[in-house]
Amino acid sequence: MVTVLAALVVGVGGTLAVERTLLSPNATDDVADICGGTAVSADVGPVTRNIPSNPPMTSSWVDYARDGSLLENCTVSVGRTQVLRVTANLERGSTADWERFTKSQIPGAAGPKMAFDAGDRAVSYEKDAAIHVPCTLPRNQPKNDDGKAITTYVAVVAHASGAAVEENDKRRQDLAYLASRVAEHAHSTMRCKEPLNIPDGAPKVGSVG
């Protein structure tokens, strides 16, 4: 049996975010509900391959978007150990700023850096994936002191602890897929003006970044 807990969480400035927690006695039960269903779509394999199949799990999904702010945070834990995390944030700056942001989120990234086809830029490591999605807001675009519009983008980062037994190449593919699904959801949520460059299925990982 799966227990679902939902709550309204007070965010910055008194705004509300939806937080949804899934408690399951088995890590493969109702896995389609993970991340509010956002990151799974019709394929649960990328999730189940990255979480142990025996211990109970807890999955939390926070989806907050208001007034040009975005926070999407999906975590899966087994016991007290976090085994999977996917986040999306609206950030300001250039691609170089995104690269610095990504390094701050995955400072210990292991394995060769590779590219995959998603967003404006996307990089893959053995246990991490990150996507840069250009995102000009439909209204209230932030401006600098000179009145010029500030470039904004959605930064998506996915991380798996490697607690589940999975080959590195397959884990790369799964994390690229999960990051892409959350990027797709974030792009729709923020109504970014730029066309969405996210493949329907799993992105191709392989070219060296």
Can you say where each PLM-predicted feature lies in the sequence?
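Hydrophobic membrane-insertion alpha-helices, especially the h-region
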Residues: 1-20
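A small/polar (G/S/T-enriched), proline-flanked helix-loop surface module common
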Residues: 20-184, 188, 195-208
